[in-house]
């Protein structure tokens, strides 16, 4: 490549007629391997075309043409990053790899040349520095830890460098065969490439500087991803080893970060055609491995990311096998998550669709039938389909490819849930069990379990309750006897009363009177937090005992019985647990406990009526007018209370549950995505909770006081009966004091019930105008 200057010097000697004084006799010019080269790449074997320890002639002794020919040879060396006789590199022995890329060593020309040609040559020398920077970047980023995207970027840069080398070879060849080849000609040939080379250098420099800035702003301990550390600790690694390895691990720019930088640079250099052309080429080539990982994720549900450079992160410690023991949707929420720093700008608006497309396919893969179907599909069409998948971000079908994959994944999972997993049948079973729809089995269960349910919550035997529930579910003639899903129903005892639990959730969410839809979103987040605790009842109980006081006897934890603490649980296998998740089941449990509380108060009032009807003290007319009037007032109050409870039950079941259930099933029929299905399910439950007055602190308190008054009055029936016996059968004179006391007690119940009922009506009127218009129907029933 390098043109020898011996002929030039020999010609000079013959013309002058005397030998060159600076040269020793018998000296020979040849290529030698210099062991202590000053090149920044001296750690590698590199050829330095230097005169072997001899002193060179002063270039000022050469004529202008000889100097130009000499500099052409020197420049061809410098263009390849090598020193020559008269062109040398600055001393860069102490430079690091990073400094070599950011600030590559510059070449300089020894003095003695004509200033005109020296200036021309000096302008072209930066090509050699840029070449050194680019080759240093290629070598450093080709290591395996930098990932596929950096490897693809380096491959694109190598192709660019190869074109550059071909140009230098062509220039060298032209200089040999063309006697008129001059520095100006060389400059003309290399000028476009010089601009491109400089642009590539600037791009790579900015890339490294931006990454260095991000690395310096990250945490010193390297604990930015706590999930990775926890996974390593769960695998049995020592904590000191994990932390030290994390600290020593160098943070590198790779994957989506590289693509993001190149994309942002396209905008930055929008007005520079040369830079834009280079960036478009680099982005296209660098995005190929990323696009391949993207296609494998959205079309196959697989993550092939050994270098953690893809936008989807997989937590290997979370598997679907855990869902057999715990029906949480943690697998859905946490197993696959988005790496925010690895999302390219091209996917920012599509990142959720990318995430869910792969998730849906992954769920299908977890099911045996889905695996068979997907395997047969892949075996048949995989090769042909992969040829149609976009390979770069600038493909015209890039966005359409993601949307089609998203639609296909949705349809696959929806079909799986609706057909083989019998989702609709499970939803109807939940309605029977939790909303007490056609609940003949539940009446039988309450009759059999009432002795156990009357005990304080801490003394209740869950085993007995479960046995009695199983007997009721299997009783011939009931709707549940033929239900194939009754095996999923179990009994639990929540040590906290319903009202206190709801008040706690409301206090967390910060809902106040008159809150709007924004408050409802906070409610949704708050109730979701209960699902994330793991075992809500035990954790909440300990916190409640420290910070919450009961609002009433019905809501008091001191002596609550099984009627106030019992709840059902519904455990389903994966993938149904994605729809019937813990978040959804908690909502079902809240509604069930509310309906059970209403049914229990209704049963107490009905039992009170039975006692009044059968007991002679109530049934027979009294000769005392005051006693007879007191009994009529007591009957009337009990009737008012029973009517109130029955109106609440009718409103919540017939006008809230049934009305929204029909709408919900209609929305399910029209659902086109699994996300829509899950959202419609949660929206249905939240609407029911809201219209059942379970999401508002004021309505909760008033309901609690009303139900407490009704329950206490019903439980006081036996005391009233004994007092009537004493008054009717007293051998002595009529006990006016006892009668006055009975009238005072009854008047207190009447006042309490009337006052709280009026408060409930006023509150319903207010919230019907600000939040839920459905409450107007309840107001009309309560005031009718």
From Swiss-Prot:
Keywords: Cell cycle, Cell division, Cytoplasm, Cytoskeleton, Microtubule, Mitosis. GO terms for molecular function: gamma-tubulin binding. Its main location: cytoplasm. Signal peptide: none annotated. Belongs to the TUBGCP family. This is Spindle pole body component alp4. PANTHER family: GAMMA TUBULIN COMPLEX PROTEIN, GAMMA-TUBULIN COMPLEX COMPONENT 2.
